Amino acid sequence: MENLKKLAGIKAAEFVQSGMIVGLGTGSTAYYFVEEIGRRIKEEGLQITAVTTSSVTSKQAEGLGIPLKSIDDVDQVDVTVDGADEVDSAFNGIKGGGGALLMEKVVAVPTKHYIWVVDESKMVEKLGAFKLPVEVVQYGAEQLFRRFERAGYKPAFREKDDQRFVTDMQNFIIDLDLGVIENSVEFAQELDHVVGVVEHGLFNQMVDKVIVAGKSGLQVLEANK
């Protein structure tokens, strides 16, 4: 499967042309896309400017000699390629397994052509088996946790190295174990109105293409937005 992820990342890079501003995603599959962009710059003379979705991706891109800009210095991103943790039949997705959901969404919103690269295990009928990440400010996080608990969302603070995980934006992540999300659009709206929630991992009706790596090869699926 790792080789298929690599092939999917390389396939996604075909949508990148010189002169573009490119969003570089975060995660195991996006990693291969970033590597391929670095190779094309070095070997093919590809000329692009990139914005990144995490400190991890920034470090990778810098090591490959990919020119970077801040998202604040661009008005529009031509194409962004990123991974996803789940994608449903309506092309809504859950992202944030790597903890970069806020920056990923900030880059996705001004993107003209948004592409996800996933393996076939991520394609589901309905979202929710993967825990939904909710990024929250540190102040009042315990109160929010209890609120989610009362609602039956089975919350858990994300941890790393036996401590609470802190995002690049210095926030906590509460993962919600929802089982099935019957209406991801409505649930996203509910979370959008919770004070203290900075962002959540529901990416509804945002993606344009999904490149799926499976045992039989690669599929490029077009979202009907």
From Swiss-Prot:
It is an enzyme of class 5 (isomerase). Its EC number is 5.3.1.6. Pathway: Carbohydrate degradation; pentose phosphate pathway; D-ribose 5-phosphate from D-ribulose 5-phosphate (non-oxidative stage): step 1/1. Substrate binds at residues 26-29, 82-85, 95-98, 122. GO terms for molecular function: ribose-5-phosphate isomerase activity. The active site is at 104 (proton acceptor). Keywords: Isomerase. Pfam families: Rib_5-P_isom_A (PF06026). It catalyses: aldehydo-D-ribose 5-phosphate = D-ribulose 5-phosphate. GO terms for biological process: pentose-phosphate shunt, non-oxidative branch. Homodimer. Catalyzes the reversible conversion of ribose-5-phosphate to ribulose 5-phosphate. NCBIfam families: PRK00702.1, rpiA. Belongs to the ribose 5-phosphate isomerase family. PANTHER family: RIBOSE-5-PHOSPHATE ISOMERASE 3, CHLOROPLASTIC-RELATED. This is Ribose-5-phosphate isomerase A. The lineage of its organism: Bacteria, Bacillati, Bacillota, Bacilli, Lactobacillales.
